[in-house]
Amino acid sequence: MINLRKTHPLMKIINHSFIDLPTPSNISAWWNFGSLLGVCLIIQILTGLFLSMHYTSDTLTAFSSVVHICRDVNYGWLIRNLHANGASMFFMCLFLHVGRGIYYGSYLYKETWNIGVILLLTVMATAFVGYVLPWGQMSFWGATVITNLLSAIPYIGTTLVEWIWGGFSVDKATLTRFFAFHFILPFIITALVIVHLLFLHETGSNNPSGIDPNADKIPFHPYYTIKDIMGLTIMILALLTLALFHPDVLGDPDNFSPANPLNTPPHIKPEWYFLFAYAILRSIPNKLGGVIALLASILILLVMPFLHTSKQRSMMFRPISQTLFWLLTANLATLTWIGGQPVEEPYIIIGQAASITYFLIILVLMPMAGLLENHMLKPKW
């Protein structure tokens, strides 16, 4: 009998990607996050689809349509809570996935890495436009503040902002187009994920040691399918705990009030997963400078392959680089905390110090550590 799995045109692609894929035998649980992100994307698309059936993108009815979903639609509260907290899980997995890539030198697969950075930016854009849709106070003011940043672009800034708004302020036209963007972007993300996987499977996975894994590879199924299912179980458990017991813990209380253009909240802040970038933006007194720093905080990932000076790929055997990596992690946690605090001392100076340190570690200290570790590899006799 002909094995369909290996001969059927469609099954063959699936087989080469998820079943007979030769995988390094030593990859750890840090390699679980790719599949977890895929599951997060599926959850977000499915819950989002059901929410969009009941949501109306009109300034007069958007807020009440979300209330209607939670009160009157069968399990609407659950779908909404899964979608809102699913976004948080998505970003938790994303940050861990990127962190893994930095620690183990996965960025040296340049095409895969660059597509990954584009994916990160697209997911951030999707989350931003999605946050505006419930039309609560923080949704409205968050949209106003963040879109207004584009006015810092010389000459075309103001025109560009009004073009995005569809008027002279965030209003019905803005909400309608943001809903359209929020609906289409996940499908663009799905297409980018396929390209990401395509480039990854051209080279094969990296591994913790950072050395050529071709000497010892095992089939993806059953070894890593079982391993991924364990990670998936933990993530689903965490998501359900969040959605069922603490659905609003990561949200903003201001979003329980309908959007009011006449009443500004005392402290405007985005969702937790944007706070690190928001803190970098606020730490620069100049508007255009802040916008450039905000973009640089993400786009800096694109230059990482060119800043790699070490003879070793992974940080597994590089103690100085490891120390800097964990300093960078602590630094990002500090920036996230600062982004949620009001603009007053001592938060301003802490934010500025953390912002400088962020760029200093990536652009200067890590490449220097790589060179120093190379020198330490040389025999002393």
From Swiss-Prot:
MF annotations from Gene Ontology: metal ion binding; ubiquinol-cytochrome-c reductase activity
Transmembrane segments: 33-53, 77-98, 113-133, 178-198, 226-246, 288-308, 320-340, 347-367
Entry binding sites for a ubiquinone: H201
Localisation per UniProt entry: Mitochondrion inner membrane
Pfam families xref list: Cytochrom_B_C, Cytochrome_B
Superkingdom, natural source: Eukaryota
Gene3D superfamilies per the UniProt record, alphabetical: Cytochrome Bc1 Complex, Chain C
GO CC annotations, alphabetized: mitochondrial inner membrane; respiratory chain complex III
Predominant localisation class: mitochondrion
Obligatory cofactor(s): heme b
Membrane topology value: Multi-pass membrane protein
Keyword Cell wall biogenesis/degradation: no
Binding site for heme b b566: H97, H196
Job description of the protein: Component of the ubiquinol-cytochrome c reductase complex (complex III or cytochrome b-c1 complex) that is part of the mitochondrial respiratory chain. The b-c1 complex mediates electron transfer from ubiquinol to cytochrome c. Contributes to the generation of a proton gradient across the mitochondrial membrane that is then used for ATP synthesis.
Subunit and interaction comment: The cytochrome bc1 complex contains 11 subunits: 3 respiratory subunits (MT-CYB, CYC1 and UQCRFS1), 2 core proteins (UQCRC1 and UQCRC2) and 6 low-molecular weight proteins (UQCRH/QCR6, UQCRB/QCR7, UQCRQ/QCR8, UQCR10/QCR9, UQCR11/QCR10 and a cleavage product of UQCRFS1). This cytochrome bc1 complex then forms a dimer.
Further comment found in the protein's record: Heme 1 (or BL or b562) is low-potential and absorbs at about 562 nm, and heme 2 (or BH or b566) is high-potential and absorbs at about 566 nm.
Protein name: Cytochrome b
Gene that encodes the chain: MT-CYB
